[in-house]
Amino acid sequence: MGSRKSTMTFIEESARNLPPLAFTPQPMDFDHPPVDPVAECERWFAEAWRLPTPNPNAMTLATSTTRGVPSARTVLLKAFDAHGAVFFTNRESRKGEELRANPVAEVLFHWDQLGRQLRIAGAVTELDDADSDAYFATRPRDSQIGAWASDQSRPLESRETLLGRVMASIERYDGSDVPRPAHWGGYRIALDTIEFWQAHPFRIHDRVVYRRSGTNWLTTRLFP
């Protein structure tokens, strides 16, 4: 259609020389999906944790304003069970503000070596102080200091300003434990929707989505 010649430069898809896996992942039967998607998530996580790559628990977290304006960033999964997927962050950040106003979110895991994607979406709730305190106590001290020094997502005049705040926090808590800031804590994303995606040659991928219905799951296979 039309006579205009495209001037776009496209990213070429070339064969990627990924290192071979040291184990054989167990394939999922997309024709007969498992009854329990939570157990299948845990199996996929267990296999991803065996990858020779850093942060296999990294996930893209998507939130939005009440007007539907989206934003996304990478966070780390810190706990997972039948109640949901847990991560921690500054609650006064942009994502914290959006979750307070519009408490729903979706996360996406992408494990290139396994040819897999996993999506989890649902309502979001804040963890209580006890759980947030317990996790904060396990963090490296430098990370604890950073939680005090950074007004996440706020304008910053210079890096020197940030480093000055880091030094001030180091001096403030010299010789004592670093307490959890009141503005820092955990969130849990309910498992309302779970989608499994497995790559195959020529884009003939497998997809299956689970949607919670009361205490049951409705399963639908999707075109790729």
How would you label these PLM feature ranges?
Residues 2-224:
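Binding-site signature for planar aromatic cofactors or substrates
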